[in-house]
Amino acid sequence: RALVELARGARDAGIAAAVPGGRLGDIGAAIVRHVGTSGSIVEAYGGHGIGRAMHMDPHVAHIARPQSGHRLREGMAFTVEPMINAGTATIRTDADGWTVRTADGALSAQFEHTVLIGRHGPEITTLLD
């Protein structure tokens, strides 16, 4: 349960950092601050832009330095979806090319939202009423 809440909180911390005029790196830096030493952030996966295609630029790194990367502008849309492992951050992909497992067999949790940079801050477009 703690890992699930950590992953959900990491996603939410990243979203809260997605403000107009900020930088993409602010998102990853907020995730890193939230997770601290309580888990491992899988660097191999990150968020991605949403637009004319499902997966497009920009890449949203979930481990980043604050004030780095592209400037966030109103109208940008992307996902924030950090994968947090209870053990090491190392993962492996099964032969089916889709299933991902932690290399050490530890538990992992991941939550995702699609975010639109609005005039006054992030707007989550994937919330259910």
Residue positions per predicted region:
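Active-site neighborhoods and metal-handling regions in enzymes and metal-associated proteins
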Residues: 1-129
